[in-house]
């Protein structure tokens, strides 16, 4: 397991595990089907799933889950990418405990993976 330590504020450090791509779909758009059933819409969601609180060591483990459907002119990509993160020095009870900058920092590796996969797939498609 590769671990990357990211300082996030004076009171918190972040250890990350490797990103995991559980689903990644590339589909050509079917405009005939869309005319009958409706066009897909772009949607990107970032959610957090709490795994564990370690009160003694002040570590919260959570999974960042990026779910997406992104509509382009000729194709649609969709899927799910996740990553386990260990927040050191802070107990987190819910996603709202993070400020916007922290949410963006937590989500960044999954978004970077999405960008990389999309670039590589669309380059050859």
PLM regions with names:
Residues 110-111, 115-118:
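Helix-rich interaction surfaces within compact, conserved domain-sized segments
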Residues 2-108, 123-124:
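N-terminal intrinsically disordered, cationic/polar leader segments
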